[in-house]
């Protein structure tokens, strides 16, 4: 009986717009980016403002850990067991919202299936503080409410998330390994 009452209370509260709980976004995925320098593949682990990218390029594996909460980014070099610390910059930010910064219009273009997820494709127009405009295509997965793909309309760049798994990600992924030493010049 108590479970039934609790369920009814949650339904009533959410239907009138009162949040009952806020959940942090946590997921793992394969991330593919395309720029004028080619395609880049990485495995991403994300937990509420912290993320780890394990780059899958030719040569030695490298890892980037972004800690926006600490205003730091660590570039790990597993071959030498060293790391380099740099300051966090907004350029490191991921495009994980279902709306874009400085968005001024959004038009539904159609529906598609990406990586097994039903998506709605939008054309989005943004304006920069200087007045410049940019157009994007954004694919939002409707089953998991997640932006699977974002591409600049002119083809300049694209980011896509594949094999997205929503769920808890251990904090261990976002800490420096104990046996790593700072590179010369780092503290």
Ranges and model annotations:
Residues 40-96, 152-163:
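An acidic-aromatic
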Residues 57, 62, 115-180:
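Gly/Pro-enriched, hydrophobic low-complexity segments
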Residues 97-108, 159:
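A short, amphipathic edge element
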Residues 1, 5-51, 80-81, 168-172, ...:
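N-terminal leader/targeting segments and the immediate start of mature chains
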Residues 42, 109-111:
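Beta-strand-rich interaction surfaces with strong enrichment in secreted/lumenal proteins
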Residues 29, 104-107, 119:
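Generic structural motif
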Residues 28, 84-85, 120, 149, ...:
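A sequence-level detector of short linear motifs
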Residues 23, 47-49, 68-71, 107, ...:
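A short, compositionally biased
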């Amino acid at each position: 009986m108590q479970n039934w009452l609790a369920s009814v209370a949650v339904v009533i509260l959410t239907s009138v717009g009162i949040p009952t709980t806020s959940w942090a976004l946590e997921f793992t995925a394969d991330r593919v980016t395309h720029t004028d320098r080619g395609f880049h593949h990485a495995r991403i682990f994300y937990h509420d403002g912290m993320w780890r990218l394990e780059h899958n390029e030719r040569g030695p594996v490298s890892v980037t850990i972004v800690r926006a909460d600490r205003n730091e980014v660590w570039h790990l070099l597993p071959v030498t067991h060293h790391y380099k610390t740099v300051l966090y910059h907004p350029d490191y930010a991921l495009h994980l919202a279902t709306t874009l910064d400085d968005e001024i219009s959004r038009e539904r273009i159609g529906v598609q299936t990406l990586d097994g997820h039903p998506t709605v494709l939008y054309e989005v127009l943004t304006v920069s503080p200087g007045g410049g405009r940019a157009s994007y295509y954004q694919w939002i997965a409707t089953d998991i409410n997640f932006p699977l793909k974002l591409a600049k309309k002119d083809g300049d760049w694209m980011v896509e998330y594949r094999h997205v798994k929503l769920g808890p990600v251990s904090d261990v992924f976002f800490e420096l390994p104990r046996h790593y030493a700072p590179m010369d010049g780092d503290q």
